[in-house]
Amino acid sequence: MKRTYQPHKTPKKRTHGFRVRMKSKNGRKVINARRAKGRKRLAV
């Protein structure tokens, strides 16, 4: 059986990347929450 997770950089960036997050108000909320928490990586 084929494994379910077959990583690819482009689709990952397109859905979870920093620029995508910044597009919407809720995405910016995510980034700000991660900043406040002190995350090293804000987005993928």
UniProtKB/Swiss-Prot annotation:
This protein's superkingdom?
Answer: Bacteria
UniProt protein name:
Large ribosomal subunit protein bL34
Which molecular-function annotations from GO does this UniProt entry contain? structural constituent of ribosome
Protein family per UniProt: Belongs to the bacterial ribosomal protein bL34 family.
Q: Name one Pfam family in it.
A: Ribosomal_L34
Kindly list the biological process annotations in GO that this record carries. translation
Keyword Ribonucleoprotein included in the entry's annotation: yes
The record's section on PROSITE patterns has: RIBOSOMAL_L34
What keywords were assigned to this record?
Ribonucleoprotein, Ribosomal protein
Q: Which GO terms describe its cellular component?
A: ribonucleoprotein complex; ribosome
